Amino acid sequence: MAGWIQAQQLQGDALRQMQVLYGQHFPIEVRHYLAQWIESQPWDAIDLDNPQDRGQATQLLEGLVQELQKKAEHQVGEDGFVLKIKLGHYATQLQNTYDRCPMELVRCIRHILYNEQRLVREANNCSSPAGVLVDAMSQKHLQINQTFEELRLITQDTESELKKLQQTQEYFIIQYQESLRIQAQFGQLAQLNPQERMSRETALQQKQVSLETWLQREAQTLQQYRVELVEKHQKTLQLLRKQQTIILDDELIQWKRGQQLAGNGGPPEGSLDVLQSWCEKLAEIIWQNRQQIRRAEHLCQQLPIPGPVEEMLAEVNATITDIISALVTSTFIIEKQPPQVLKTQTKFAATVRLLVGGKLNVHMNPPQVKATIISEQQAKSLLKNENTRNDYSGEILNNCCVMEYHQATGTLSAHFRNMSLKRIKRADRRGAESVTEEKFTVLFESQFSVGSNELVFQVKTLSLPVVVIVHGSQDHNATATVLWDNAFAEPGRVPFAVPDKVLWPQLCEALNMKFKAEVQSNRGLTKENLVFLAQKLFNRRSNHLEDYNSMSVSWSQFNRENLPGWNYTFWQWFDGVMEVLKKHHKPHWNDGAILGFVNKQQAHDLLINKPDGTFLLRFSDSEIGGITIAWKFDSPDRNLWNLKPFTTRDFSIRSLADRLGDLNYLIYVFPDRPKDEVFAKYYTPVLAKAVDGYVKPQIKQVVPEFVNASADAGANATYMDQAPSPVVCPQAHYNMYPPNPDPVLDQDGEFDLDETMDVARHVEELLRRPMDSLDPRLSPPAGLFTSARSSLS
């Protein structure tokens, strides 16, 4: 049957080619109704050139005709009347056509099957665009559709069997009434004369015996029909359960997992349309079978016959009710999750959807959905069916919404657009747990009436865990909790259990996913970047990523304990990197201009043999979200320089590209790319001269130690090329600084740009004032500009 199911999905020219294969010699209706039988016969085993195989071909012809006749006999009622005549006609037609040449039937069917398979194969390989299968699904998805076709045919078959049972029972009841009428006639015989009474009595007795014999035999037949029908329903329910398990426990759970990973920056979870179509097919077939079972129960009540059927029917009825209950409750899902970091007094949205809403007439009486926030412990109690009514952990405004049915898309959903968490009630914290580690969830509840109020279901679904914050400063640590939960939560967990330790490669995958999403870049974390992060986290020196693969990272290491020697956690440092890139440096990161994940020693090793003026940009160790410039310039004191880190605050004043453009002695971006080639397109255009006669001041980046170098470089572009040849200094010299520290260098020998920028801003303010109006009291301290060695252009 699988071949015919695939053939039915052909389109365009391929479909037309398939239709040409059929005609009076072999009607397409025969192929359709006997698909399973035809595909299970050994057509290829017959040698068309061997007369000895004629007998086997004749048997196949006879089998085909018998199957058609049997199929015709099973068609009952008004719907089946025309089909019954057609199938009977086709049986006679094929018998007459191939009776004398059964080998031609074999040749015909082999030709049809071969070309069907060819068309399907070509469509799957996309060799003929017009004949492409609609569905480019995976093999598993194809199997799901094949199972649906099998369920559809089985349900059709049980419907025919039920109608046959009903007609047989109705005729039985008529004959039973005739038996009662005969029984009544015996009572009237006393009014007749003896001779006539005897003659009449004998005839009635013969008729009664014959009828009772028929009734006994027919009662057994009816009972057999009932048992066979129930057994078929039992098999149908087994297949339904299996199909429902695949869709709800595999495909839907996989979609939910994708939704969870999307919260960490993974690919979008995808449309629900395919899942909804499967769930709707399930609902339709389940409901049809349930109605058939109820009609069978009614027939048994109408004509009770001792036996096991009533008990069997009660069992299958209970089973199918359980199946539909599981379907309805499992397909009430959250299509759009609420924010997982939820700030109080802030508007947020969410969308819930019922995937079977259009098929079970739920939309005829639109249900209302209510949203509440509950704690992790309350969620655990809820799943244990413990009484938690009205036990909430906060108050959500605008938390009720009526589900709406959208005719065009066939979706039943509720859109919460203006919810707001008014207040939150926190639980007692455990040990070192902070408020940003406490998890809550939004509970959505409703009541659905199915099938004209035949069944009523209480449905509930929980959102992904949310962390509630009251201030923006808590956002970073709350995001860490969400990241860890989304990445490492296991299917079917108790809310909201998550491993306390994970392997380093698992964390690498989560960090890379988050990094690419936050920075909005296809340039993720390289192997070298991950080695740097591992060294930072584990305080190890190995440069081989494989050495860290078996190492575990605990939640405490990730975002509870500070890194050794620093006043921040691993996550806080990494999050700072993402934030500064996201806000200011996405294009530079995508261009490969920011090396980023290197420390001072690594920067020294990379630059030491490069020409003077070669520089690289790396993420600061001492400043969260800081970026520093390391560059090569040979001088009597040292040959490697590190500028004090810039932060988001600095880049909001002047961009990285403009700052680099100000420093003329920075010539090559590591390893050897000309600076202007990389950054010129990001320089701020020079403003035109003011028309009011005033000269507009500018803030420019200046490094005091290199003021002269800047001036010379401005006059002579080859200044850096004329500098002394680089000398490879020992590492001890790399860490040594002049004995008299410069007043604008910090204790690590890095330039204090905050002071430099403050001076520049002060000078700009002075230049904007008329000279004769300056108050001497506002003049800067004597020697300030000299000591700072700043320059203003």
Curated annotation (Swiss-Prot):
Modifications the protein undergoes after translation, according to the UniProt entry: ISGylated. Tyrosine phosphorylated in response to KITLG/SCF, IL2, IL3, IL7, IL15, CSF2/GMCSF, GH1, PRL, EPO and THPO. Activated KIT promotes phosphorylation on tyrosine residues and subsequent translocation to the nucleus. Tyrosine phosphorylated in response to constitutively activated FGFR1, FGFR2, FGFR3 and FGFR4. Tyrosine phosphorylation is required for DNA-binding activity and dimerization. Serine phosphorylation is also required for maximal transcriptional activity.
One GO-annotated biological process of the protein: regulation of cell adhesion
Modified residues (Phosphotyrosine): 90, 682, 694
Keyword DNA-binding attributed: yes
Renumbered residue ranges of the record's region Disordered: 772-793
Membership in a protein family: Belongs to the transcription factor STAT family.
Subunit details: Forms a homodimer or a heterodimer with a related family member. Binds NR3C1. Interacts with NCOA1 and SOCS7. Interacts with ERBB4. Interacts with EBF4.
Name of the molecule in the record: Signal transducer and activator of transcription 5A
Protein source organism: Rattus norvegicus (Rat)
Name of the gene: Stat5a
